[in-house]
């Protein structure tokens, strides 16, 4: 006979679902972690369960999670372990083969649980002698083990649904939308899922830290709720969108730096109220009448302008960074992959020339797939034009240019101004390359080693200077500029007065 355990912990502090394995059903010792669950965290109080006086088996061969409940076989012995809000334990025991049902640890909290199964306990159908006397009895409903199993599963579903509602109601009103998603996902979507992996859901007491880890097979469900969550492309963890911007688009699960829009980067780096954009009226035309079978180039530009609210794939302007006047250009990967066309190159060139004339430090944040193919050689020409302007800025005026490489930085941007900085800073785990992995493998027919185009690997090869996380970037830039004698305006004013 196969023995199955399901461990459910419900409390005011957390709502978690975990799978654990016990050594024995007669003498339940500490619960051990298995490969089904990768989270080894268990409080001491969670490691103790209760003895079963009526159990006739000593080994547990299998364990299940929330999604596995519905896949139980008729020969399974099923045990549910749970905890109420007062941390008092209770246990529910099912022997599906022998149709045995029991509850251990008689506590007042169990009365709520008993209601879920009262329809079965009080049913005359449990008494085989009375079945023939009931005209409403459905002979096919409980006569086979599969139906009995399905009924128990429905009871468990009903009970879990009620307890999730109790635990979720503790949360404040600001998490109502998340609560709705949580309940729908566990009790609705997962019911139709064929995935057998376990799922972990955690809600903290401050109401601002939601995390739901799921396997890559759940991408369809995630897309349905993408207006609430941002999924990490590395660990597939979900980040609550409401707080994602305040966390600088850094995944709460693995710390991966996800893509940021140019507007968010400007807001992150530039002091509030000091941003003055340049050349906003410039936009791309179709200089070579690029032919496309799918969508005309002009129409594609228009669609990206409506989607992003930008006129081109870069924003340029001047502002203050901790009081230090700077000229800054930030590329936006959401606009045609941050591709560099004639307008992007012209805006960068004008920014460099302005910084040269005003003796300002220069920052260029790179996020691009390379030169824009729809503009042909005109886009390639921007590489030389920008490099020429930077030569005058760096060599003749002796000013400081800081290049910041984000993910991805590839193609013509990498081959030109991306690698020309006096100081080159990279974000953690940034994808930096000239040609992409797919292009290299198809061209050379060789496999590109995994991670060979990541910032950490290239850092050890001396390709750039520091790797700086986003939360430290503004402070690092401020110190670098002050090291090169660029000081805040109020600091210069105080020096002049003295």
Curated annotation (Swiss-Prot):
Gene3D superfamilies: 2-enoyl-CoA Hydratase, Chain A, domain 1. It catalyses: N(6)-carboxybiotinyl-L-lysyl-[protein] + acetyl-CoA = N(6)-biotinyl-L-lysyl-[protein] + malonyl-CoA. Pathway: Lipid metabolism; malonyl-CoA biosynthesis; malonyl-CoA from acetyl-CoA: step 1/1. Residues 228-498 form the CoA carboxyltransferase N-terminal domain. It is found in: Plastid, Chloroplast stroma. SUPFAM superfamilies: ClpP/crotonase (SSF52096). One of its GO terms (cellular component) is chloroplast stroma. Binds 1 zinc ion per subunit. It is an enzyme of class 2 (transferase). GO terms for biological process: fatty acid biosynthetic process; malonyl-CoA biosynthetic process. Its cofactor is Zn(2+). Component of the acetyl coenzyme A carboxylase (ACC) complex. Biotin carboxylase (BC) catalyzes the carboxylation of biotin on its carrier protein (BCCP) and then the CO(2) group is transferred by the transcarboxylase to acetyl-CoA to form malonyl-CoA. Acetyl-CoA carboxylase is a heterohexamer composed of biotin carboxyl carrier protein, biotin carboxylase and 2 subunits each of ACCase subunit alpha and ACCase plastid-coded subunit beta (accD). HAMAP family: AcetylCoA_CT_beta. This is Acetyl-coenzyme A carboxylase carboxyl transferase subunit beta, chloroplastic. It comes from Populus alba. The gene is accD.
């Amino acid at each position: 006979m196969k023995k199955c355990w399901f461990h459910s912990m419900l409390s005011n502090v957390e709502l978690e679902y975990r799978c654990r394995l016990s050594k024995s059903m007669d003498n339940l010792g500490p619960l051990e972690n298995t490969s089904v669950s990768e989270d080894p965290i268990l409080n001491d109080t969670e490691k103790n369960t209760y003895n079963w006086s009526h159990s006739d088996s000593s080994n547990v061969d299998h364990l299940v999670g929330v999604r596995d409940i519905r896949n139980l076989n008729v020969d399974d012995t099923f045990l549910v372990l749970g905890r109420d809000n007062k941390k008092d334990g209770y246990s529910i025991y099912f022997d599906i083969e022998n149709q045995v049902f029991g509850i251990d640890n008689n506590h007042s909290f169990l009365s709520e649980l008993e209601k879920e199964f009262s329809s079965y306990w009080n049913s005359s159908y449990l008494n085989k002698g009375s079945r023939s006397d009931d005209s409403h009895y459905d002979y096919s409903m409980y006569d086979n083990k599969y139906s009995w199993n399905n009924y128990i599963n429905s009871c468990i579903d009903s009970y879990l649904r009620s307890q999730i509602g109790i635990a979720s109601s503790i949360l404040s009103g600001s998490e109502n939308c998340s609560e709705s998603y949580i309940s729908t996902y566990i009790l609705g979507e997962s019911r139709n899922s064929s995935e057998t992996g376990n799922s972990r859901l955690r809600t903290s007491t401050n109401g601002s830290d939601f995390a739901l880890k799921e396997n890559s097979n759940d991408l369809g469900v995630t897309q349905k709720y993408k207006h609430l969550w941002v999924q990490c492309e590395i660990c597939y963890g979900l980040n609550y969108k409401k707080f994602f911007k305040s966390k600088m688009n850094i995944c709460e699960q693995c710390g991966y730096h996800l893509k940021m829009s140019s507007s968010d980067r400007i807001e992150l780096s530039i002091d509030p109220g000091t941003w003055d954009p340049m050349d906003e009226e410039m936009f791309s035309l179709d200089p070579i009448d690029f032919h496309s079978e799918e969508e005309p180039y002009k129409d594609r530009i228009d669609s990206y302008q409506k989607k992003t609210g930008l006129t081109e794939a870069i924003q340029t302007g001047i502002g203050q960074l901790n009081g230090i006047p700077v000229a800054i250009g930030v590329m936006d990967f959401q606009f045609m992959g941050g591709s560099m066309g004639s307008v992007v190159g012209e805006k960068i060139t004008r920014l460099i020339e302005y910084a040269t004339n005003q003796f300002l430090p220069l920052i260029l944040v790179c996020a691009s797939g390379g030169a824009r193919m729809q503009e042909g050689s005109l886009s390639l020409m921007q590489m030389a034009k920008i490099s020429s302007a930077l030569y005058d800025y760096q060599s003749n005026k002796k000013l400081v240019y800081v290049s910041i490489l984000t993910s991805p930085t590839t193609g013509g941007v990498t081959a030109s101004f991306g690698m020309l900085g006096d100081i080159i800073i990279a974000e953690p785990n940034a994808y930096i390359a000239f040609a992409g992995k797919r292009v290299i493998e198809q061209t050379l027919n060789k496999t590109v080693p995994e991670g060979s185009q990541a910032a950490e690997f290239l850092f050890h090869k001396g390709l750039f200077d520091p790797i700086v996380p986003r939360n430290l970037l503004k402070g690092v830039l401020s110190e670098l500029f002050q090291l090169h004698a660029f000081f805040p305006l109020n600091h210069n004013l105080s020096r002049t007065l003295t």
